């Protein structure tokens, strides 16, 4: 999305995908950049073709308000979780087949990400993460350490055994799946963490919080390295780095700020949504950003820079 060392980045809205099936709490883009997955609060999952903007698959999830969704690395399956405390996994090639149900959490499932095609990680309002064998529909391990709801998680791009979580206890934590334990805790946030995301090429991660502050931490130094503060103190709903890591996308209210992490300046604000932006997703080549919103739309943005 960014253009080398230039500060002026030309990001343009290209298309709008209209859901009309309820608020969109989460979106994901397939690894190959061909498809977008959107979840709606009316318990519907839609798969969109990003080339044609057409809906290509429709799944009804047995939930009471979906909160999270994810593509598998191969796009052969999708996962979703919500207020019914479990996660469902669908085979995308057989839309009418019964989903695999991953049951075990004692609270809502707020976030999920695939480790690989056969394994999934979920975070929950029961303060735990669970690492699942999808084929067996069984939890391999339960990771405990947060004092309140877990809201967001992300994997270290260079090592999927390591991941970070953020939650309502204002803490970010680093975990190792191999030993199923917490490696480090990162204090510093002064309100609930709504979103957490790794820098694409190293061991830094960013948190977006309810108080409108985004903080970037280095897991090697166990220290905060920079901070963004919203002028309006509006809650940050989602954060995501550009492919190079130079830009930080920050979703708050109805806008997405594009912030230069080197100069510590806002380059532009992406507008057009009529309700809060809840989720951000980026194609693996970094050329397309998607914003999902409670206005029942997904907006697509691209840059020629």
Swiss-Prot record:
Subcellular location: Cell membrane; Cytoplasm; Nucleus
UniProt note: phenotype after gene disruption: Leads to starvation-independent sexual development; the effect is suppressed by cAMP.
Primary localization: membrane
Coiled coil feature spans: none
GO CC term (a single one): heterotrimeric G-protein complex
Keywords: Cell membrane, Cytoplasm, Membrane, Nucleus, Repeat, Sporulation, Transducer, WD repeat
One BP annotation, GO: G protein-coupled receptor signaling pathway
Membrane topology summary: Peripheral membrane protein
Chain positions of WD repeats: 19-49, 61-91, 104-133, 145-176, 188-218, 231-260, 272-302
InterPro entries membership: G-protein_beta_WD-40_rep (IPR020472), Gprotein_B (IPR001632), Guanine_nucleotide-bd_bsu (IPR016346), WD40/YVTN_repeat-like_dom_sf (IPR015943), WD40_repeat_CS (IPR019775), WD40_repeat_dom_sf (IPR036322), WD40_rpt (IPR001680)
GO MF term (any one): signaling receptor complex adaptor activity
Function: Beta subunit of the heterotrimeric guanine nucleotide-binding protein (G protein) involved in glucose-induced cAMP signaling. The beta-gamma subunits (git5-git11) promote binding of the alpha subunit gpa2 to GPCR git3, which senses extracellular glucose, to activate cAMP-PKA signaling and repress sexual development and gluconeogenesis.
Complexes and interactors: G proteins are composed of 3 units, alpha, beta and gamma. Binding of the beta-gamma subunit complex (git5-git11) to the alpha subunit (gpa2) facilitates interaction with GPCR git3.
Name this polypeptide is given: Guanine nucleotide-binding protein subunit beta
Species, as recorded: Schizosaccharomyces pombe (strain 972 / ATCC 24843)
């Amino acid at each position: 999305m960014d253009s080398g060392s230039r500060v002026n980045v030309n990001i343009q809205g290209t298309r709008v995908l209209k859901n009309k099936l309820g608020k969109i709490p989460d979106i994901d883009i397939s690894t190959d950049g061909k498809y977008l997955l959107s979840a709606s609060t009316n318990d519907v999952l839609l798969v969109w073709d990003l080339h044609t903007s057409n809906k290509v698959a429709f799944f009804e999830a047995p939930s009471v308000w979906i909160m999270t969704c994810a593509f598998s690395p191969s796009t052969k399956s999708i996962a979703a979780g919500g207020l019914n405390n479990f996660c469902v996994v669908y085979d995308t090639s057989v839309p009418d087949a019964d989903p695999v149900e991953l049951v075990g959490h004692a609270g809502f499932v707020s976030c999920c990400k695939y480790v690989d095609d056969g394994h999934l990680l979920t975070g929950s309002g029961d303060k735990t993460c669970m690492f699942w064998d999808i084929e067996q529909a069984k939890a391999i391990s339960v990771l405990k350490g947060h004092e309140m709801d877990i809201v967001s998680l992300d994997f270290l791009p260079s090592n999927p055994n390591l991941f970070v979580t953020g939650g309502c206890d204002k803490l970010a934590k680093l975990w190792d799946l191999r030993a199923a334990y917490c490696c480090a805790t990162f204090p510093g946030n002064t309100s609930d963490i709504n979103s957490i995301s790794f820098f694409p090429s190293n061991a830094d991660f960013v948190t977006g919080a309810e108080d409108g502050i985004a903080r970037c931490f280095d897991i090697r130094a166990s220290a905060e390295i920079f901070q963004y503060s919203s002028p309006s103190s509006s809650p940050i709903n989602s954060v995501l780095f550009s492919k190079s890591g130079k830009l930080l996308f920050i979703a708050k209210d109805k806008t997405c700020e594009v912030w230069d992490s080197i100069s510590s300046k806002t380059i532009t604000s992406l507008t057009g949504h009529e309700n809060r932006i809840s989720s951000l997703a980026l194609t693996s080549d970094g050329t397309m950003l998607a914003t999902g919103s409670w206005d029942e739309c997904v907006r697509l943005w691209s840059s020629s820079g």
